[in-house]
Amino acid sequence: MKDLKHLIFFENLLQDAQNELVTQAVNDGKIALGYNCYYIPEVLLNLPGCFSSRLRAPRCESTDIATYYMTSRTCPYVRSILERAVEGGYNYLGALFGAECCAAMERMEA
């Protein structure tokens, strides 16, 4: 049971894309490399002086703005990512890597 506090710490980190560890790394001068898919080669994400951050949109309650720019038939993940980007949730990113795996994601990243 005493190990549960460690699980709660990691669970809390997942509540926001720009969490405590991301903020600390950016403040230390590291460059945040955003990526959307696990097909991105790991060697590109582990460059010296950089750290990787998977594009996520936890607690995204509405995709109204994203639906204005994309059809409502687009995957909810893509609309949530676009919604979070419009809200400024990825302003900490220094670069963005996109994989050719999803047509909707490719359109959003263009």
Which functions belong to the PLM regions below?
Residues M1-A110:
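An N-terminal assembly and electron-transfer interface module characteristic of large anaerobic redox
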